[in-house]
Every structure is written in structure tokens, then in C-alpha cells.
Amino acid sequence: YPLETIDSNVIGLRKLLDLSLEFNPEGILFFSTSEIYGNPDSDNIPTKETYFGNVNSFGPRASYDESKRLSETLCYIYNDKFELPINIVRPFNNYGPGLNINDGRVIPDFFKNILENKDIEIYSDGTSTRTFCYISDAITGYLLALLSKDKGEVYNIGNDVPEISMSNLANLIIDISNSKSKVVYKTNEDIHYLTNNPQR
């Protein structure tokens, strides 16, 4: 739903910000995404909030990444022009209870394979790495960002370490599940696969 994604992230947010001007809120927290960074080069990993990004505007996930980038610009304008007290958070790979098994992220995908008695399929050589942030830790970060007296700021919410490879993550999930599943490595013909998904 690329057009609906753009409408929700941009037009929906604009309407919400306009409405907020009538109520003089003490604070607004906008949830952006780490995907606005695109594919940082090795000099920008871990990725700082000041990194402008390296995003592909032409691909299947571009509507999400680019609409979030434009949404951040809207937040900046409303803070700068109208002094609306907005802060922005960019979540990195949160996980924990309540994660939808069908949401397409790596941890639920791996568990879904196991629950269906299937092997875990990794569409790479398994060496790519990620860091993960437990949801209660992320919520602490979100709350601190919301309550901060400094407004018009951007905060990455995630962990710098430890990194884990997709291969090791798959084997860890197999081990803690006492599963007989195996890890199977495949290639993906989609050139956009694993893009715009910063490590940390």
C-alpha cells in the first residue's frame, strides 16, 4: 500500500499537527524510523542522529522511508514556525512480547518458521549483522524523549552493541526453542532486499 503509506505518514501527520496547534500540548513525540538513514557507509555505523542518510528513493520500500523523511521535515517546520513542542524518535530493531508473528521482521519471521515446523530460511549468506533493543528499554528512551525540556530534537532509540549475525540469531532461536529446524541459506533476486535497514 505505497500510496496509503504516503497519505498516512504525510497528510495524516499534517492534519494532526494542525489540530495540535489548537490544544497547546506540552509535548508531542513523532515516531520516525531508522530506515530514514538508508544504507550508511561503514564510517557511519553506528549511525548518529546527525547523519543525513543514504536512501534509495526508487524501490518497494521507498514510500515508507521517504514519507518518514518528509514527516520529519513537517515536524521540524511546525516546531520552528509554530513552536509546537515536538521531538522525534528513530527506533532501531525493537523486539519483545506482543510482536506480531506476521509483521515481516526477522525475529518473528524466524519464530514463525519454527512454529510451522519449517527450516529457517535466510536470503543471504547469514553474515549481515543487527543489534536489537528490548521493548522495555526502548519505551524508557521514548518516555525520556517525550519528557525532555529540549524540543525540536531527534533521538535514535536502539543499542550500539552487541551485534549478532543473522546466522547466529537463527541458531540461537532454534536452540532456545528446542527446535529441530535447520538454517537454510538462499539467494534473493530482489536487488532491494536488505536495503534501507541500518544495522544500529
Positions of the model-derived regions?
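Short, solvent-exposed loop/turn segments at secondary-structure boundaries
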Residues: 1, 98-102, 195-197
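Hydrophobic alpha-helix immediately C-terminal to the catalytic Tyr-X-X-X-Lys motif of short-chain
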Residues: 70, 74, 78, 110, ...
